[in-house]
Amino acid sequence: ALPRAIGNPMYHWCHLELKNFFGYEGVLNGQTAQQVWDLALEKLAQPEFSARNLIRRSNVAMIGTTDDPCSDMHYHDLLAKSGFETKVCPSFRPDSALNIHKSGFAAYIRKLSEASGICIRGAADVAQALSARIAFFDTMGCRAADHGLDYVMYRQGTMEQIDRAFAKAMAGEDLCVEEVEMYQTYLLLHCAGEYARRGWVMQIHFSCMRNPNEKAFAKLGADSGFDCMAVTDSCQALYRVMNALEREDLLPKTILYSLNPADDQWIDTLLGAFQSSQIPGKIQHGSAWWFNDNKVGMQNQLTSLANLGILGNFVGMLTDSRSLLSYARHEYFRRILCNLMGTWVENGEYPADMETLGALVEDICANNAKRYFDL
């Protein structure tokens, strides 16, 4: 399939990984597949291809894992004691506690109650349990939280309404959209305030259509390759979420990712409405994500951010791949960034000042993220 994927980033990534890690500079196709397979087997048997050595070869300063609030952090504790030079920090992912409308919610709340030591009878108890787990994650070096939302919601409700929705969910009853949104808004604002108090970074991912193919979902389950972009009305709600937090001086450092590139420009104008003179680039437009994680998608995100914001304050690329070879995607990003900046210079839109340009590239690709995540 790979030779037919002309223009697809998978073609670029695969060849970058083969070159950077395995020293293979040929083309992967049906004729070379056995040669590449044999080379990979030979290399992977060598000590320098251990997981830690692959990370060392990529010069990784920090890895942020994705962790459920109920995690006991056992392996993080072992890693911290092992002396591994790359920081491996947990990231708080409380989606299961917020997804009141999804199956398995009641069982998850019982698990959260056990992990936190909080008897959970209502929504305020869920908030207290999450606060307890946030405090624990903080002791383990957590620097960021991540919220995966189908869309951004903002619907205020009374505690009586929110508790009624919670009770219905715990009893296995269906909830209306308004009930789901009131509960999720309450907990999103609560968690964001906790992040702000600790100097964490809040990441919000949205505009994803999950499991549209019911037949495939029934056969293979979630996260099996059938999700897609969504058109969502998240703009007004996100403004209101951020305004509610800013009003109370509880807006944390925030990175926003939309799966729909049509959202790029309004996101980039939103950044300017909530920036801070104390933290350069406090509110970030996250790097082109998932379906946009390709040459054109990256160029479009970078161009929109440059046109409407300050590209020099951007915290740059991340890879959320589970592959230890995926750090090659950072090189992919750097190539695209430098090509774009070089085009602007050649067009006379920026001086050919190599010292300034070099410093900008270093900041976008490394230094800004180090400062932003307090590394």
Mark where each language-model region is.
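C-terminal amphipathic alpha-helical interaction region
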Residues: 202-204
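Metal-cofactor-binding active-site regions of metalloenzymes
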Residues: 1-198, 249-252, 256-268, 272-375
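A short acidic, glycine-rich active-site loop
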Residues: 177, 226-232
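Divalent-cation-assisted or electrostatically stabilized phosphate/pyrophosphate-binding catalytic cores
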Residues: 232-238
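Hard-cation-handling environments
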Residues: 208, 213
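Short glycine/proline- and charge-enriched loop/turn segments
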Residues: 217-225
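Short, basic/hydrophobic alpha-helical segments
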Residues: 241-247
